[in-house]
Amino acid sequence: MEESSMAQASLICLLLSFSIIMLSNAADISIDCGSSSSHIDADNRTWVGDTDFVATGLTSKFVPFSKFPAELTTLRYFPTGETNCYTNIPVEKGGKVLVRTRFLYGDYDEESTYPTFDVVYDGKHRYSVVTTTFETVTESEAIFIPENGNISVCFFRTLSSKTPFVSTIEVRRLDDSMYTDLGPKEGFILQQRIAYGAQELVRFPYDPYDRIWMPASVFASHLTSSATSIDTTGADNRPPEIILRTSWSQKDMAFYDIKLPFSGVTFYIVIYFSEPLSLGSDQKRSFNVYYEDKQVGSDLIVPPFGAVTQASLRDVVKTELAYLTFEATPDSTLDPLINALELYVISNSGGSGNGTNSTSTSGGGSPSPGGGSGSPPSTGGGSGSPPSTGGGGGSPSKGGGGGKSGGSNNGDGGTNKASEDEKSADSSGKSGEEKSSSNLALPLGISLPTLLSLGAGGWGVWKYFIKPRRHPESELPLKQNISLQVNMGNATVVNAGQ
């Protein structure tokens, strides 16, 4: 009898272990496209071959000029068919997932064609992929809620002369409490995810959800947190602590950005703030954030020391002149700051890829209005050593915000949300920072007037101009501008006004 009970207990433990393994497999998976074998990378991520997920296409392996992880040196390409799909990728039904595809062309076909094509996530959320060099790692990423226990990732030929391909597919399970602004039928198509002041990109293991945060280290006032630890629970999206240890702080600047793929797209922006200094009783940092004339978050931003708050804005349509401004309150003694930012296009409806392969070879087709479009950022290889946080230049739909939510305000055409941790300031320490009541305006991606180099993985053309927020457009000193052509994290001055 005792042996029978022990056998039953062992069987139960075995079944529980199997269930945990199955749940883990449904949560996170890394597919090495074009490979039939598995391997473990330097950051202890397990990569599996792609033969269980795709039945079409051909494989290629090449030796790149630069050093790349093994998973980026193989790929699968699709010389025939209008749409080719990876299917039966396991996920948790109804749970939020992040799906990332990466592309390293490497001139595998020796044609120097620089492929362009679309990727469609789960038959709904579409993004246009543009490769620009042999050695540039291009990526696309979407956050959405799967309706079933498996998803598809499809590659759609947009030009008959261009062959779609893919190097890796990564699926990461997100906590249900994250990205509460995401509606059940929507997708967030990543445009930018930036850690201001960071020296290197940040991802797993420093971000347990394996989001990739690009560094932005430029000639701005760069602050490093003196907090022993930073509580990240005050922000719904759970930014990793390491990106909250650096920030930009600046005044009297405004930037506008043409980074989003085209005017008319609807987007979601979320910004993270953490006070780096233990403020004295005579010090205060408080400000509002505006995208054009729409407030980001419905509450005043008072960054908490040793904690984090987030402010977000969604359902805003991108216009030709898009700028982000941080406006200090009259009683603020310190400049506004920013730690990190995420920017997404909101996908509301499907693309053309429905999880099945199409044999048409005619090509053509345009991106779905609900999806994103444009050239994704370049991120290179793995995370390597811990990202540096010191020195250098500066860097709802439905649902509430993290911490103490400010609710919503739809009167300005966008949905606002802010979360704030109002911990009392430690008056024992005083900052050497100068008193200032001023405005900080940053590009959604990167830039400051003295910027000559850039590490935020942005692209497109950025411009800045000095602009007091409340001045009418006719008074903007547009001659004081500088255009930066951004590619692969480097900036080149192409035009400067007087």
Curated annotation (Swiss-Prot):
Which portions of the chain have biased composition (kind: Gly residues)? 362-414
Q: Which residues lie on this side of the membrane: Cytoplasmic?
A: 463-498
The domain of life for this entry's organism is Eukaryota
The family database entries (Pfam families) matched by this protein are listed as: Malectin_like
- The membrane-spanning stretches of this chain are 442-462
Sugar attachment sites: N44, N150, N354, N357
Signal peptide interval? 1-26
User: Which segments carry the region annotation Disordered?
Assistant: 351-439
UniProt topological domain (Extracellular) ranges: 27-441
Q: Which UniProt keywords apply?
A: Glycoprotein, Membrane, Signal, Transmembrane, Transmembrane helix
Gene Ontology annotations for the cellular component aspect, listed alphabetically: membrane
Recorded topology in the membrane: Single-pass type I membrane protein
Q: Where is the composition biased (Basic and acidic residues)?
A: 418-436
Report the main location listed first in the record: membrane
> Subcellular location, in the record's words?
Membrane
Coiled-coil stretches: none
Q: What is this protein called?
A: Uncharacterized protein At1g24485
Please spell out the taxonomic lineage of the organism that makes this protein. Eukaryota, Viridiplantae, Streptophyta, Embryophyta, Tracheophyta
